[in-house]
A protein has these predicted regions:
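S-adenosylmethionine
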Residues: 1-273
Length: 273
């Protein structure tokens, strides 16, 4: 009935309708026809938001659920501006700014970003550290880890280490080491279908179960890397309950020493599922 259904699998459409109900499903389908919002995140390692607002060559609008994120108009080209090459900001999807915003990192913490490439979340975690403590940014893909390193360097991060390891290999070196850990887990990518229709092919090839099992393996390793009393923030870009609530259910059932911590809403319309 709408253009988006031309590339969304029927099984996925039916699944979303069952999950959301008629009213929310209609709003979800309508979202495919709405414009994409573009964002940049000010790198507070190099400049304050107040100072950047004074010198910004772009028309900016604050993203309400972040401390240092801004919308910019489609007509702008921030990736071609000298400020970008100076590392004053990172171009990032507005919603993708949320995980690093929510993880309560403080200067002096030892932090792990376990699935870190290309570096949008790692560079914000580093900014929250303000040069104190340390950040280990890991990505299993060597080529993606190179892009991660490039962005870490561009943002002027001096207390980060970039590695490319499967999470289980980190346990022998870093068991019980980290105060805060971010798992931005590999997933079926359902939340990316509007931006990148090519993700649909991956969804059809692998399915939800493949990523659910992958996430469980990551969880099994990461829980061993956290200090007692430390915090893990888990995020995905998918709607799949198996990969979201299901993964948290797996963690809590297998590691009862963990408990869910309620996150206060940063924005009244930014609701959690």
């Amino acid at each position: 009935r709408r253009i988006c259904t031309l590339y969304l699998p029927e099984s996925y459409v039916n699944r979303m309708k069952e999950l959301l109900g008629d009213e929310e499903f209609d709003a979800y389908m309508q979202s495919f026809e709405e414009k994409n919002y573009r964002g940049l995140r000010v790198n507070t390692l190099k400049i304050s938001t107040e100072e950047f607002e004074k010198i910004s060559p772009f028309a900016l609008k604050k993203i309400p659920w972040t401390d240092n994120g801004y919308y910019y108009e489609d007509s702008e080209q921030p990736a071609k501006h000298p400020y970008y090459y100076a590392g004053l900001y990172y171009i990032q999807e507005p919603s993708a700014m949320t995980p690093a915003q929510l993880l309560p990192v403080e200067p002096g913490d030892k932090v792990l970003d376990v699935c870190a490439a290309p570096g949008g979340k790692s560079t914000e975690l580093a900014a929250k550290l303000q040069g104190e403590g340390m950040l280990l940014s890991n990505d299993i893909s060597n080529s993606r880890a190179k892009a991660l390193l490039k962005n870490i360097e561009l943002m002027g991060v001096k207390n980060a280490y970039v590695v490319s390891e499967v999470p289980e290999n980190l346990v022998s070196r870093f068991a019980g080491f980290f105060d805060k850990i971010l798992i931005d887990a590999p997933c079926s990518g359902e939340g990316m279908f509007r931006k990148e229709p090519s993700m649909v092919k991956s969804w059809e090839e692998h399915g939800v179960e493949f990523f659910q099992n992958l996430q469980r393996g990551i969880i099994d390793s990461v829980v061993k890397l956290l200090k007692p009393g430390g915090k893990i923030l888990y995020s995905t870009c998918t709607f799949s309950p198996e990969e979201d609530e299901g993964s948290m259910k797996y963690l809590l059932e297998n590691y009862p020493e963990f408990q869910v911590e309620k996150i206060d809403s940063l924005w009244q319309e930014f609701a959690g599922g």
